[in-house]
Amino acid sequence: MSLNKTIYEGKAKAIIETEDLSIVIQHFKDDVTAFNKEKYEIIDGKGIINNHISAFIMEKLEKAEISTHFIKTLNEREQLVKKLKIIPLEVVVRNVAAGSFCKRFNIKEGERLASPIIDFFYKNDDLADPMVSENHILYFDWLSSKEMDEVKTTTLKINEILVHLFSNASIYLVDLKLEFGRLINDSTKIVLADEISPDNCRLWDKNTYKKLDKDVFRLNLGDLKEAYLEVAKRLSVKLG
């Protein structure tokens, strides 16, 4: 199935083409980065954990009628996914104040938000992923007004599902970064892309507020792999 040709390689994943032009393989790497690649390390097995957690969550979302690129897990590091034209936006939904949100508004980390807040960022490493408004998105034609409403509605639905999922595992979903893309064979169809794992969620233990996400690496708080394994264990994700 695989032609072994990598058509895209990012910080944490690689995309490999297959004989079917509408399907690709998503390969999870052990690389971990922070601060726009200023901090970098390889953590053995990190990609395996994220592959399984993301597959578990994508399957949950599909059952909840959220359209995703996920097709199936191939092996410990790879998934078969639909090929997409990625929309150059990071869609961040926040439930609790943390990270850049606190710095931007000078508020204390951990403050609960009355309702989820959605922020958009332009995916561009050279520009350090600047925050953009809905007017910017319309101006650059990344999404139409109707598509933007669709993405926001889907984002809030995903957030609601995952807040409940993680809460049942005694974890707070603090915030979540999503990406979307258009199907190669139907550009009118926008689906959830990328991954959902501790790499792109902020996750805190509900009792101790211990961080169980990439902030462990960013802020030198301990063993990243141990934190990710704890998330997998609490979600009852089987790693092999």
Curated annotation (Swiss-Prot):
InterPro entries: SAICAR_synt/ADE2_N, SAICAR_synt_PurC, SAICAR_synth, SAICAR_synthetase, SAICAR_synthetase_CS
Pathway assigned in UniProt: Purine metabolism; IMP biosynthesis via de novo pathway; 5-amino-1-(5-phospho-D-ribosyl)imidazole-4-carboxamide from 5-amino-1-(5-phospho-D-ribosyl)imidazole-4-carboxylate: step 1/2
Membrane-traversing stretches: none
UniProt keywords, alphabetically: ATP-binding, Ligase, Nucleotide-binding, Purine biosynthesis
One Pfam family from the record: SAICAR_synt
EC main group: ligase
One of the GO BP terms on file: 'de novo' IMP biosynthetic process
EC number per UniProt: 6.3.2.6
Catalytic activity: 5-amino-1-(5-phospho-D-ribosyl)imidazole-4-carboxylate + L-aspartate + ATP = (2S)-2-[5-amino-1-(5-phospho-beta-D-ribosyl)imidazole-4-carboxamido]succinate + ADP + phosphate + 2 H(+)
Keyword NAD: no
Molecular function via GO: ATP binding; phosphoribosylaminoimidazolesuccinocarboxamide synthase activity
Cellular component aspect of the GO annotation: cytosol
Keyword match Nucleotide-binding: yes
Family: Belongs to the SAICAR synthetase family.
Protein name: Phosphoribosylaminoimidazole-succinocarboxamide synthase
Organism of provenance: Wolbachia pipientis wMel
The encoding gene: purC
